[in-house]
Amino acid sequence: MEIVFSKNALFLADVILTDSRSLFGEKAFTKMKDAISLAIKRIEWSPRYGSLEPALADEEGEYRFVLLNKRFKMVYKIEDENHISILAIWDVKQNPNNMRLYT
């Protein structure tokens, strides 16, 4: 199973992790980093582990998400049985229609 982060997902993850550390401290940073790592392991173990992403239901392909915590979710697309693309680490307070920018 190959899991690939898009450039946008890498950028968003970096911003979120950097902000977690600078605003809330090392413990918050570690907690978020561990949540991302665990989500990747779960997706690798079972690609359909995440729920279907309702904001992308009209898009072609199978888009899913895994909650990282109360505020963030990891949005991904199952490309085929051996490839998954991580599209975004999404702040759930954002307008879900903007998620289409990452597909």
Residue ranges and their predicted role:
Residues 1-37:
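Arg/Lys-rich, positively charged N-terminal/basic patches that mediate binding to nucleic acids
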